[in-house]
């Protein structure tokens, strides 16, 4: 089946499915991605063995329900999709979902799993975090604060990496001054890669078995590799009890791109 046929078939199925559905304005995605106090969940799924045995026309119809669920919940949640297949051995797809209420994320995931497409998804992992105002930045030097405001390089950053982190009990027992000094060293090591590697931090303590979820986007995986090597050399790294497990690597995709990838 050609790409044009796939797009046409998906469009027809989706259009018919939403003929009588109300149109919602959609949540303010940029606000959710920049505000503090926003929940972020990472839902990782693998497709079951039955998926590959389905006829392409059936896969198209079931993938159209994915688009329908995303559209249904866009008023309350911001949803980003990533194709992991071929780059990560843990799963096939990743959903990063933001909302001001965690129950809105839960509602989306419940509807996703109960959809015709979702019935082929096996949950491979689920992580939850919360965005907060920078904890240590107020104690940084003025120059470092200014450096942190540098804009990232223009252009798409197609690769996404998700790395969960857990700190040791010793870290949480350190006094504030020592923590600030070590995080400032950590930040100094990361500054050379600030423009080519976008980073977002989620706080997970109490919401998950993690302390942090670190999310990265880049078009230069070699820079990300160098960034990780640099961060492993700073003093703060000795207090990291768990990093990765899993480490997720994928490609950013729109809903339509994801559908085209999975229908093949």
Region locations from a protein language model:
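Short S/T/G/P-rich N-terminal loop/turn motif that feeds into the first structured element of a domain
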Residues: 25-77, 100-105, 124-194, 205, ...
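Bacterial N-terminal signal peptides that target proteins for export
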Residues: 1-10
């Amino acid at each position: 089946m050609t790409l044009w046929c796939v797009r046409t078939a998906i469009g027809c199925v989706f259009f018919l499915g939403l003929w009588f559905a109300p149109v919602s304005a959609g949540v303010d995605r940029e606000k959710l991605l920049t505000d503090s106090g926003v929940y972020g969940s990472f839902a990782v799924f693998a497709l079951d063995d039955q998926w590959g045995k389905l006829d392409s026309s059936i896969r198209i119809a079931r993938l159209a329900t994915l688009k329908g669920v995303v559209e249904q919940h866009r008023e309350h949640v911001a949803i980003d999709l990533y194709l992991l297949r071929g780059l990560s051995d843990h799963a096939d797809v990743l959903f990063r979902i933001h909302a001001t209420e965690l129950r809105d994320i839960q509602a989306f995931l419940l509807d996703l799993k109960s959809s015709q497409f979702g019935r082929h998804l096996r949950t491979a992992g689920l992580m939850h975090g919360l965005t907060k105002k920078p904890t240590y930045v107020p104690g940084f030097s003025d120059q470092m604060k200014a450096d942190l405001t540098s804009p990232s390089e223009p252009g798409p950053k197609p690769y996404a990496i998700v790395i969960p982190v857990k700190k040791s009990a010793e870290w949480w027992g350190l006094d504030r001054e020592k923590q600030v000094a070590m995080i400032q060293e950590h930040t100094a090591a990361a500054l050379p890669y600030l423009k080519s590697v976008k980073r977002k931090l989620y706080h997970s303590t109490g919401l998950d078995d993690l302390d942090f979820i670190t999310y990265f986007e880049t078009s230069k995986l070699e820079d990300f590799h160098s960034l990780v090597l640099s961060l492993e050399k700073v003093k703060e790294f000795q207090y990291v009890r768990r990093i990765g497990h899993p480490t997720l690597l994928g490609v950013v995709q729109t809903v339509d791109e994801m559908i085209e990838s999975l229908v093949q």
